[in-house]
Amino acid sequence: FFFSSRRRHTRYWRDWSSDVCSSDLVVIASACRTAIGKMGGALSNTPAADLGAIVIKEALNRAGVAPEMVDEVKMGCVIQAAQGQNVARQASIKAGLPIEVPAITINVVCGSGLKCVNDAATMIKAGEADIVVAGGMENMSMAPYAMTKARFGYRMNNATIIDTMVNDALTDAFNHYHMMITAENVCDKYGITREELDEFSANSQQKCEAAIAAGKFDDEIVPVPVKVKKEIVEFKKDEGPRAGTTVETLSKLRCCSGKEGGLVTAGNASGINDGAAAVVVMSEEKAKELGVKPLATWVAGALGGVEPRHFLYLNLHYHKNTQYETDFTYLGFDGLHGRSFGSGTGCSSKQNHRNRSNG
């Protein structure tokens, strides 16, 4: 592993068999997630705070960290309407952490969970904490509808009901159009074709199908108890992946973005999902003190901003910021994973890494 500081531009290499350690290294001690539920699926009646509590508790258990040892909890959550105050605080207390442990909910839309991880690492590097739980939680299925003028009355004419899922999570607040249009904008900007989108999506689905069949995700998934009719069963299999997806099956789907001649379909766009994930972040010294064998070393994180209508290009911006911060390239990695809103983002940001992306 290596770490690089923007100020020093010094690279540190770490061999876990060595007794020598660098004091400013940050590690991931454990990680877990729920299976991902589709809209209206198995998790549709489980609040985001409950999902968050499940993964926080399990992440601590896997790391062998007692709840009272945690300095802070940071959890991302985008759709917070009608969820109650500070969803992260709810999840923290439901997970059994002491009331003295502070918790903060972060919303930078798609990047919320990873922003929590980066902030946790920054706190630890600054000496403000030794152990932080970070992650994200969301239940899009439970997003409520809102009537913004109902409090003082509509008096006359029709009332508008706002879908908080679409309004707060899936609509560009500046241009007032759906995220699917921003995906179309990226395709226009980079000359991406429908065939490329479908090929990328089919490849991603096939990799996921193979990984599920091989049990690659089994260890990271925490079962969630859900009620099915009169029984309580364990939900532990992702609902989003479609087995048997091919370029041919995807090519038959109609555009759903509303744009004439559009390229985005239900098959090459992101799903609407419910789920949660959490990691335990700590200093290397604390990991050594506790006898924890880290899963990974946190190297760097970056946040960027671009023109809202092209915000799905942000993946490239993050990559450039991270490369500046750490002075490394992606050429040395066998695999890359990118968070993106559908294959439009994937095609635009991974053209040079297609064979190693999300594999």
Predicted features along the sequence, with ranges:
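Single conserved hydrophobic/aromatic residue that forms the stacking wall/gate
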Residues: F1-C21
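Conserved active-site "lid/cap" helical segment
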Residues: S23-Q83, V87-A95, I99-P102, T182-R194, ...
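N-terminal extracellular/periplasmic Venus flytrap/periplasmic-binding protein-like
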Residues: C32-T34, S44-I54, R62, E196-E289, ...
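Conserved catalytic cysteine-centered active-site region
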Residues: K74-I131, A173-H178, G244-G271
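Active-site-proximal alpha-helical scaffold in enzymes
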Residues: V108-E138, C187-K216, A278-E285
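Flexible glycine-/small-residue-enriched beta->alpha junction loops
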Residues: I131-N185
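Cationic, amphipathic, low-complexity alpha-helical segments enriched
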Residues: L312-L316, L331, L336-R339, K350, ...
